[in-house]
């Protein structure tokens, strides 16, 4: 009873309307702002398994060391690409059917040094007949993309060069990167400078080399490209590479 009386006295003495309001509201924020920036290693296998791991997992060793396991592969699978980027780095995934997908590195599932990773079908909206032909890390600042050029090569020998700026806005479902004939597919995509050479290799062991600046920059993504090489019957392009700089030799 004493406590009750004291509380009533306090109520009478300090009976002031509340100055603040408590309301329901939706908190808007970018989840990426909560992701720590750190150096990570991305590993991809021939059968399409991918994973992310911290770079500090790989300690420096002296020359002649045994190295450290980075991934556990299944039978007849092997690592085809490994690169180190920032966790906020955008990464492009180009499918053989001409689509491009974009993921920030932190969205790639993290795995241990002994795990095989996750299949690309689990993290990208790929259809059953699709596979990824090229995986490309890009500058985090998209303003730098205007200065870069991207070269596509197909199995039939078509090539096309675009400004990387054409690929800034990519939906979660992907975007058409290059239109292809029904029997054609993308075999490689590279960032290339005018002072570099493009090198294409064929299934039958042929090779052609030409200057990147000889390719005009196409506007948009609707073109199928231009012919780069005269292929023999049943031959096809299997690899795209670039030289560090052009030489006349």
Residues covered by each model-derived region:
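C-terminal interaction appendages of subunits in large macromolecular complexes
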Residues: 1-244, 248
